[in-house]
């Protein structure tokens, strides 16, 4: 990581989006926070302030812990997985875990000047049509749009000093 962030610094990069995953929090919350802190220390050494992405609606909806499948050569983001996975997204009884994740991660780093911003949900309206659309719940967008305000509320409750945002996929979100 140090080597690659050094390359990024050499190219003039001063920020980057870093995608996190709720399953890693579920597996080992304290270890996850420790690793994020280590990453932030390395990034700061290279004058890079990341935007941490908490949730993502793009690519493989069947995320799981453990050994991941090998990347497919020549396929863009072939190993990328969504957070939350489709099972969690469709199960409101799992939402307290998501709340714990958001409040725990954001709360731990709410005043950390090494972080530029929090992208609460990347492309919440992306239906993943070109890659995994056939695996997605038919009502995925409705599920995400119902959870999105809650995710923002959790991040606000954690009292983040950094801006909160959501990188939308398409359309006019001014009324949301």
Question: Language-model segments: what does each one mean?
Answer:
Residues 1-176:
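Active-site mouth of glycoside hydrolases
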């Amino acid at each position: 990581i140090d080597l690659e962030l050094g390359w990024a610094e050499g190219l003039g990069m001063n920020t980057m989006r870093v995608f996190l995953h709720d399953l890693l929090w579920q597996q080992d919350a304290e270890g996850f926070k420790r690793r994020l802190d280590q990453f932030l220390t390395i990034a700061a050494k290279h004058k890079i302030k990341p935007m941490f992405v908490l949730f993502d609606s793009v690519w493989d909806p069947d995320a799981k812990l453990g050994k991941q499948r090998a990347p497919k050569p020549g396929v863009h983001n072939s190993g990328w997985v969504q957070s939350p996975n489709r099972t969690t997204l469709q199960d409101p009884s799992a939402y307290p875990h998501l709340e714990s994740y958001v409040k725990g991660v954001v709360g731990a780093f709410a005043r950390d000047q090494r972080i530029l911003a929090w992208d609460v949900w990347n492309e919440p309206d992306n239906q993943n049509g070109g890659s995994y659309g056939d695996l997605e719940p038919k009502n995925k967008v409705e599920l995400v749009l119902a959870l999105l305000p809650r995710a923002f509320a959790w991040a606000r409750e954690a009292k983040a000093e950094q801006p909160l945002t959501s990188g939308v996929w398409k359309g006019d979100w001014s009324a949301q």
